[in-house]
Amino acid sequence: MKKILLLIFFSITQLVALHSQYSIRGRITDSESHEPLYGVSIFIADLKTGAATDTNGNFTINNVPQGTFLAEIRMIGYASKAEPISSKPNSAWNDSTLLRIELLKTPAEYHPVIITGVSGSTERMRNPVPTALNTKEHMLKHSSTNAVGAIAELPGISMVSTGNAISKPVIRGLGYNRVVVLRNNVRQEGQQWGDEHGIEIDEYEIDRIEIIKGPGSIMYGSDAMAGVVNFLTPQPVAEGKIGGEIATGYQTNGGLFGSSIMQEGHLHGISWQVRMSQKLAGNYSTPIDGYIANTGFKEYNGSGFIGLNRKWGVSQLSFSTFNQTIALPEGERDSTGMFLIPIRINDTTAGIQALSNDELKGYDYSLGIPFQKIGHHRAVLSNNIFFRNSRLKLDLGIQQNNRREYGNVLAPEEEELSMKLTTSTLNAVYFFPETKTAQLSAGVNLQHQSNLNEGEESIIPDYQTNDAGAFVFFRKYATKWFFSAGARSDIRLINSEGLYLDSTGITADSSAYTTTKFSAFNKYFVSYSGVAGASYQMNKHLVWRLNLSRGFRAPNMSGLSSNGKHEGTFRYETGNKSLKAETSLQVDLGTTYTSDHFNLEISAFYNSIQNFTYLTKLNSTFGGDSIADPSDPAPVYTFVQGNAALFGGEIYSDIHPHPLDWLHFENSLSYVQGLLLNQPDSMTNLPFIPPMKYQSEINAHAEKEIGPLKNAYFMIGASRFFAQNKVYSAFGTETATPAYWLMEAGTGADIINKKGTVVLRVFFSANNLLNTTYQSHLSRLKYAPANPLNGRQGLYGQGRNFSIRLVIPVNIK
């Protein structure tokens, strides 16, 4: 596969252009003073190229094909802008034909461009599909411990967490295999069915995150029922630039230290970027339990790309490697409340040791037994090839996820569980010749997966899956209307291999076995999905949106065949081979109002799901928990299905009153309720639905420079997580969670030299400012064993945490 990627890459570079040189040139000024703006970023996502304005506000983008493209224009302190810009032959440009663009001085995000789930770059405000966006600037101002934590505070978004290192996105109450995670528009596949399986993406490499709420995209096939999260890395810098950055950060709670170094450039149509980063964290502390044993992690990552921009289009070969070791807390304590950890007494004897709060500080006990090692490596070749009036987008990728778990204190290097998942993907989209008001595209997605178990134990079988899908998508523009519609067909083929054990638990062939761990089977699933939506721009301030979509999710191997307990979880899971494919029908209604001093977004949805798959706890014949392995007494859960409905919505407002344009008052409210239909009272609520969430933030920013400080800001915010009493209480599957408040604050600025160049960016923040004792309803540690000293169930959320981040821009050329 790697040879194929390289062959295609070098073959494309030999294509010969058949038309003359085209370019894009323009000038950007302040909308009030009409002064030229220096350092404005102009980026065309469909071409993976852009430019930055010079001291006269001018910019030039060379080596582009003929056509009109949607550009995103951004500068800190100004409203971003989506602008359609057209290329012309080099000889056609002069001072009178330059593009004239003005930016409004405000930090509000008015018209960002999105590229996720649509056939081409689209202005977010006009897209009928509900979306959310998080930028690098926002992530720098709001600290988190992992990539998913950076989006969990957005309206309608939550996360399932297991400590500080492991988090999984939840969109409007749905997560796991119902959320497709992308890295630069290509699926990230890493055994995402597991509670303690996080997202293998380096937080430092993220430039922005785009989110689709619901099955509104037909571009990605099975599993996108809840939506899509697309982690986008920085795009190539402007032609002629060479630079980079050095970033570092420290958090006081747990001692998390991270750093990253990046170098990039773009010369003569060849762009490149290389990044290396690392993180190290010890045990974190909570207000009620002090330091929590075995909650540290360490991480070493690398990524980069090399790209080629020519008249025929763009080709980019990217790579990434993610390497993480995570300690898995078990929460066992003695009668005095001290945490217990397993220790090795001699070669044949294991014991336990109680650790005081002082002993748990630092890093010495942060990576004990049990722990995970995760390696995720991927290479992707992305191509955008332009013809005279059409283009072809082709992505080829290969990735491998190695997930190993260690739980034997007498043999700490013994891999009790080892899963190697290899995924190959092909995504192709052909964009037909478009008119001024319409665009048609069609595409195919192919994916092959192979899972191989190499450890002492297996909780899912060895298997192979093959996915194939085809879709067509249409967009129509009118003066005030925007229409979009699409249809898709998918098939998934599954080949699951059997595993048989003899009386000693050793693998045997089918003729000598005494126990069937996994039985062999073959299955296939076929489904159809579609989307239709419209937006209506009543005036320059107000837009209405309506969208109807049908989603599809084939059962995963965990649901069909799991059989075992995972380290870091508190349950034993068994699969169900009779599971059917889930299908859903969702309707979304929304409106957006934007003005110079007030922004408002309101979204509502209703989602009906057939054959909804969920876990439920099993009771034994004696009425208590069913226990599969008395030596490791975890309760047994199994997968069942039923029809379900989810409904709710989000409200977001941003007030920045005149003449206090430097002040922003942001508020948001998110609500979702999930119901299982035709069930008894204790089983009517969908399990593990996030509670209603209210967030409020006041943000003040300096409009002018203060000595050597530029873009200085101060913010303070509060989040209210309401009580979640609507739980799936049957068999003790889920417990209620009380309400709580969390407060945060932050400040920072860019430090400039005498020439006005930014030499250092500084960001301070404080999370859980009041040191509140709380449990997140979606925390898996909530179900850890109770503390014998006070009877409190589970482990609690991180206490007060101060953070500092430093970013040093490097400008070589």
Task: Describe the role of every protein-language-model region.
Residues 29, 40-43, 74-78, 92-140:
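Short, acidic, small-residue-rich periplasmic hinge/interaction motif at the N-terminus
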Residues 62, 186-213:
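Short acidic/polar hinge/loop motifs at secondary-structure boundaries
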Residues 95-102, 147-150, 165-170, 182, ...:
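N-terminal periplasmic accessory domains that precede
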Residues 190, 205-207, 218-288, 294-302, ...:
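Outer-membrane beta-barrel translocator/receptor signature
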Residues 281, 293, 313-385, 400-423, ...:
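Flexible loop and strand-edge segments within Gram-negative outer membrane beta-barrel domains
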Residues 415-429, 574-580, 586, 599-664, ...:
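Outer membrane beta-barrel strand-and-loop segments of large Gram-negative receptors
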Residues 605-609, 626-724:
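Gram-negative outer-membrane beta-barrel transporters
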Residues 609-611, 615, 720-727, 749-813:
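C-terminal beta-signal and adjacent terminal beta-strands/loops
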